[in-house]
A protein has these predicted regions:
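Phosphate-ester processing/binding pockets and catalytic centers
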Residues: 1-344
Length: 344
């Protein structure tokens, strides 16, 4: 399906993700979440999948990004992302640095000011030890995670105990001043946890990057006023209620999303291409984040990352060609999910 300026037919972008660990942002398998989308006719996408198979010559029945990431298939990978490849100008990927996403969501919950997150995140290395920072992230993850296997106040008190310890240890530093601001949100934190324990958890989990990434994807493809539909690989968290929330939020924010449907990746070649791109982008972005990026491969990815990402690390952000922005999906004081804010 393509955009028709005469009759207003929607473009349909096929989507998939890589790096999802649900709400577990500190002890999962990956440090980056990537959400990729592809706009191609089904027939063309199927032809590209066949060509990838022919170039790789692997006996595998199902191809994943890992096949393309093997060094022996580097030429195929470079072709796929190149200007002359099948995805150039027809695909997009939204990147999320999980640690920054977590700090951003914590600042939004406690302060209604996600801008504080970027300042704290960028001061971390000059202030805290690696272990202290990991402990802070773990406490924040526990605070925001929607689960009811512990008393409402326990994650709150554990988080603020850690905040107080860091403030005392680094008194007088800019980071300590930022942490002081977090203490203003204790009542909000208690309300949030009490709502979860009382069966009033937010419809959209605060720590799951998928819903906001879908909205970002829709915003990208609906730029210029064209309507867009999304065909997404099946995900357990994309219930009918959450899909309705995504569609309603998009309408209220002026994003031209006309619908979101779930498909089986194995039956949609476009989604398979999106799966390739998501896995490739996640690996390249993680490599850059951890100081082991390949400049040539990162340069090939850069045209697909667009101008925004939920990304706090300055060096890797610049190399990936993304502009750091807050995630924009928050919760109210009682843990009720709010709409995407004005950054959209």
């Amino acid at each position: 399906m393509t955009w028709d300026h005469v009759n207003g037919t929607s473009v349909e972008a096929a989507c998939d993700e890589s790096g999802s660990d649900g709400e577990n942002l500190t002890r999962g398998n990956t440090d980056v979440f990537a959400h990729a989308s592809v706009v191609l006719p089904m027939e063309s996408a199927a032809g590209h999948i066949r060509e990838i198979r022919d170039r790789i010559r692997s006996p595998a029945e199902e191809y994943k990004a890992n096949h393309l990431l093997r060094e022996k298939h580097r030429a195929v990978l470079e072709w796929l992302l190149s200007v002359s490849g099948p995805l150039y100008g027809q695909a997009h990927v939204h990147l999320v640095e999980k640690a920054f996403f977590l700090v951003d969501r914590t600042a939004d919950l406690l302060l209604d000011d996600p801008g504080t997150a970027l300042s704290l995140y960028r001061s971390r290395r000059a202030t805290f030890s690696a272990e202290e920072w990991r402990e802070f992230l773990t406490a924040a993850n526990r605070l925001l995670w929607i689960r009811v296997d512990e008393a409402a106040g326990e994650p709150v008190e554990a988080f603020f105990h850690h905040i107080d310890r860091l403030r005392r240890a680094y008194s007088g530093t800019p980071a300590a001043d930022l942490l002081e601001r977090f203490t203003q949100g204790r009542e909000r934190a208690h309300s949030y946890r009490a709502a979860i324990l009382g069966g009033r958890a937010p419809l959209i989990p605060v720590l799951n990057p998928l819903p906001s990434s879908i909205l970002r994807t829709a915003a990208h493809w609906s730029g210029g006023g064209r309507p867009v539909r999304l065909a997404h690989d099946r995900q357990n968290m994309l219930t009918p209620e959450r899909i309705a929330w995504i569609e309603d939020t998009a309408r209220r924010r002026g994003i031209g999303l006309t619908g979101l449907r779930l498909v089986v990746a194995g039956s949609d070649a476009r989604v398979q291409l999106a799966d390739f791109l998501a896995g490739i982008a996640r690996r390249f972005a993680s490599d850059e984040l951890n100081g082991r990026g390949d400049p040539a491969l990162t340069a090939l990815l850069r045209p697909y990352t667009g101008e925004s990402a939920v990304w706090g690390d300055e060096g890797s952000r610049a190399r990936l060609g993304a502009v750091a922005e807050p995630d924009n999906v928050g919760t109210g004081p009682a843990g009720c999910s709010t709409e995407v804010n004005s950054a959209f």
